[in-house]
Amino acid sequence: MKISTKGRYAVRLMLDLAMHNTGEAVSIKDISKRQGVSDKYLEQIISVLNKAGYVRSIRGAQGGYMLKKDPKDYTVGMILRLTEGSLAPVACVDDDDMVCERENGCVTFYVWKKLNDAINGVVDSITLADLVEMQMQMSDNYVI
């Protein structure tokens, strides 16, 4: 499994909004400058996030985007699944409703299941609030 640029940038975009969660809208242009990602590409990503109800769009001269909820209410897993779809490494562990006909006799199923559980466990345990805190700690520790 490889996370696409879209998924990585969606997490960065949401983190940027969380870092600038002051009650005022943040423009795509400002996010683009800070993240080094084209505003056109960010507009495509923010559209997906907006349709899913993750962000609120504010129109007008002082317009931009804001998180709809508190940063602690978004996990990295939520953002990645929205932009990437399933994070399962193989199809046989992709859906709980799907029963693999070889599951009982397939030793490798155990590997894929453990890998899937590990991936989901990690991305579902990290919130935007966690990332904000980590980013602030990294910034505090950065000394020239």
Tell what function each PLM region has:
Residues 5, 9-11, 15-37, 56:
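N-terminal helix-turn-helix DNA-binding core of bacterial DNA-binding proteins
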Residues 33, 50-51:
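Alpha-helical residues within the helix-turn-helix
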Residues 40:
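Key DNA-contact positions within bacterial/archaeal DNA-binding proteins
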Residues 46-47:
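Short, hydrophobic-biased segments on the C-terminal half of alpha helices
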Residues 54-62, 66-67:
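Beta-hairpin "wing" of winged helix-turn-helix
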Residues 76, 94-144:
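C-terminal regulatory/oligomerization modules of transcriptional regulators
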